[in-house]
């Protein structure tokens, strides 16, 4: 996850975790201090949505971690709704203020499996995926992520960035990745694109690579102006909407004047047959 540098924590007099996790003004200032190549990235940890669904994170000034899953079995997840926790409210208040100040924000959201593994023991997630309850579980996680993305876009996020470190071919195996994970991801992306046609969706490099390796998508290169950084190229593209990826937002300042557009049309057509 994105980490606030120590010098910035000192400048902002952040001593206790609450100073950065619960204070929209400090989040706003920290985010501005970390702007790179015209972009601000939020949030500073990957536990906000899990917490809004019932997980209990351990907070530190460096971020937040979930040590113990809040639930024991998939059936317990089926009626849960996203709650507006104090941390979520502070983060979204900062996001709204940054957008109001004319800043461009890329908002990171955990993908379906990483989110589920923050709520349930990992072995329960994987065993559920092999059973009928797995389909229900993935459908439920899709609802949560769409709702969370809506909350971010409504407050001005220009890019929704997806990372799902647990969802790689190496971890899942190609059969589970292609047959269970990809349909869920595809449905999620279709819904987000329909709901927010002008918002760019950025898939992390590892997830894109797994999609390429299993022939689930095709890539098209989109060229920006010469000599630009990756961040500047994203700015030029922004507003066009679409899914981009095969690269990492950690490298916004890197020299890269093109984007890789991700197309699932062939996969979508096969599913509809």
Predicted regions located by residue number:
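Active-site-proximal, glycine-rich beta->alpha crossover segments in alpha/beta enzymes
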Residues: 56-151
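N-terminal basic, low-complexity leaders that serve as flexible interaction/assembly modules and, when applicable
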Residues: 1-59, 178-200, 212-273
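Short, internal active-site loops enriched in acidic
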Residues: 46-48, 112-114, 165-169, 205-210
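Glycine-rich, proline-tolerant flexible connector loops at the mouths of alpha/beta enzymes
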Residues: 39-60, 65-84, 159-177
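Non-catalytic positions within long, well-ordered alpha-helices that form the structural scaffold/packing
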Residues: 32-33, 150-154
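Active-site-proximal loop/short-helix segments
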Residues: 108-126, 155-180
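Short beta-strand segments at enzyme active-site cores
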Residues: 40-43, 106-108, 157-164, 198-204
């Amino acid at each position: 996850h994105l980490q606030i540098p120590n010098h910035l924590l000192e400048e902002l007099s952040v001593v206790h975790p609450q100073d950065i996790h619960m204070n929209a003004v400090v989040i706003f200032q920290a985010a501005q201090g970390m702007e790179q190549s015209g972009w601000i990235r939020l949030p500073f940890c990957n536990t906000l949505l899990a917490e809004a669904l019932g997980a209990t994170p351990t907070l530190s000034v460096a971020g937040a971690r979930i040590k113990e899953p809040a639930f024991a079995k998939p059936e317990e997840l089926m009626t849960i709704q996203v709650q507006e926790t104090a941390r979520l409210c502070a983060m979204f208040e900062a996001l709204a203020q940054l957008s109001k100040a004319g800043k461009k924000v890329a908002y990171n959201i955990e993908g379906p499996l990483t989110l589920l593994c923050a709520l349930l023991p990992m072995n329960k997630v994987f065993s559920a995926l092999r059973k009928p309850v797995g389909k229900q579980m993935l459908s439920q996680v899709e609802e949560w992520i769409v709702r969370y993305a809506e909350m971010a876009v409504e407050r001005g996020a220009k890019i929704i960035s997806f990372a799902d470190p647990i969802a790689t071919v190496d971890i899942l195996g190609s059969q589970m990745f292609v047959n269970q994970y990809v349909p869920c991801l595809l449905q999620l992306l279709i819904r987000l694109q329909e709901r927010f046609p002008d918002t760019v969706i950025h898939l992390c490099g590892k997830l894109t690579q797994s999609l390429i390796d299993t022939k689930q998508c095709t890539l098209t290169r989109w060229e920006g102006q010469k000599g630009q950084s990756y961040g500047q190229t994203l700015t030029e593209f922004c507003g066009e909407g679409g899914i981009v990826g095969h690269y990492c937002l950690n490298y916004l300042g890197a020299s890269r004047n093109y984007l890789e557009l991700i197309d699932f049309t062939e996969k979508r057509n096969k599913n509809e047959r």
